[in-house]
């Protein structure tokens, strides 16, 4: 049904909730994981072909997972080359796993053909020192052999990561490498019904974490204690794989918002905001801010500031619909100069912001006045993204609010359900 939150809301919005639980049963289909895996693989393949690529080399965690549906452990992340995947033509993906871990892949992920499980050749971004050239040569030769095996040798190879070692080795091997990240971004931007349900569950976990934050906050706690408590809360949830950050900022740390936490003691009357920056459930990630006032009622000035930020947020949500563009959304926000007196939009980067959510915290579209006004991206059915706004008074207080949403053909589904209409007041005196 239509919402009345914010100012000037006229389009159809609804709040959506998770449809199913997070554990498996024999009497409910819930999320169809096989359908999800097939959708992701074939979406990547379709975009690969649309870009004229014979093969796609995926070294970033989110892309490797998208095409193989295998897990990158925490110690392995942000180290392109420890594990990677290759998609060639119409073939099943080839997974290059570190060492003998491939034996576990064969057991846990049987949709990867056993003959397509290989061991990787890593140089760890050059940390192998003088051995890097040796390793990248072996790496390159293995890629060439797989492209030959699947009949795409000599065709363009899309890559989502490149470094100086790879450039030289690819040139020697005669590999024509081109941008492959754009194709993967396009594929990841549209979520099927199963991915959408994953995101509803992610948001439901976020709702619970904010409720737990509300109960745990009190004067005398420190920011890092709140972060630690919510981390522990989250990692007790089945299917929870990772939390990139639980941002907790209080008092003068809230403006400018430095997106961090410290050992600062929270005091009566402090504004505190918490962001679930990429809690990760079965690979899918959140971004979810809420603002609290601890120990006292917020001042009228604080409430007015919050109302301004809330208006900016819901004005931008109102602009979301299939067929419009990121320009129309970003245009709902004031310029950096109008809002804060900055001379350039980049000075306010991420203050008024939108970004896709999925296997990465930054799937398309990414929305900002920095680029969206001149480089608009069309909003499509199946996109899942967050919109977030903030405002404040330097070194005194700041507020930040964020909603996660799914774009449907005829409506916008808001999946973050912790109350947002006003600052959440915790234990006022």
Give the residues covered by each predicted segment:
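Active-site neighborhoods and metal-handling regions in enzymes and metal-associated proteins
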Residues: 1-429
């Amino acid at each position: 049904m239509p919402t009345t939150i914010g100012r000037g809301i006229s389009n159809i919005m609804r709040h959506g909730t998770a449809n199913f639980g997070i554990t498996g049963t024999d009497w409910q289909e819930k999320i169809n994981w096989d359908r999800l895996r097939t959708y992701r693989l074939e979406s990547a393949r379709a975009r690969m072909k649309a870009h004229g690529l014979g093969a796609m080399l995926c070294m970033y965690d989110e892309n490797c997972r998208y095409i193989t549906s295998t897990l990158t452990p925490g110690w392995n992340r942000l180290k392109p080359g420890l594990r990677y995947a290759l998609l060639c033509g119409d073939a099943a993906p080839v997974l290059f796993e570190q060492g003998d871990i491939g034996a576990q892949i064969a057991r846990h992920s049987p949709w990867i053909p056993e003959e397509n499980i290989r061991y990787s050749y890593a140089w760890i971004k050059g940390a192998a020192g003088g051995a890097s050239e040796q390793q990248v040569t072996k790496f390159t030769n293995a890629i060439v052999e797989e492209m030959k095996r699947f009949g795409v040798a000599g065709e363009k190879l899309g890559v989502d990561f490149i470094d100086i070692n790879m450039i030289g080795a690819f040139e020697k091997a005669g590999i024509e490498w081109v941008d492959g990240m754009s194709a993967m971004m396009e594929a990841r931007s549209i979520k099927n019904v199963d991915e959408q349900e994953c995101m509803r569950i992610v948001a439901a976990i976020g709702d619970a974490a904010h409720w737990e934050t509300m109960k745990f906050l009190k004067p005398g706690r420190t920011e890092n204690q709140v972060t630690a408590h919510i981390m522990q809360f989250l990692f007790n949830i089945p299917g929870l794989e990772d939390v990139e950050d639980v941002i907790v900022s209080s008092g003068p740390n809230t403006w400018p918002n430095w997106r961090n936490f410290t050992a600062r003691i929270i005091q009566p009357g402090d504004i505190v905001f918490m962001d679930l920056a990429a809690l990760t459930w079965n690979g899918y990630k959140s971004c979810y801010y809420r603002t609290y006032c601890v120990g006292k009622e917020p001042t009228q000035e604080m409430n007015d500031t919050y109302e301004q930020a809330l208006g900016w947020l819901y004005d931008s949500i109102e602009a979301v619909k299939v067929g419009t563009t990121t320009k129309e959304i970003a245009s709902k926000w004031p310029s950096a100069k109008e809002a804060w007196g900055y001379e350039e939009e980049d000075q306010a980067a991420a203050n008024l912001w939108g970004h896709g959510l999925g296997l990465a915290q930054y799937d398309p579209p990414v929305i900002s006045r920095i680029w969206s006004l001149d480089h608009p991206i069309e909003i499509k059915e199946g996109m899942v993204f967050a919109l977030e706004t903030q405002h404040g008074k330097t070194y005194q207080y700041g507020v930040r609010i964020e909603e996660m949403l799914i774009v449907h053909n005829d409506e916008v589904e808001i999946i973050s359900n912790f109350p947002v209409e006003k600052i959440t007041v915790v234990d006022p005196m």
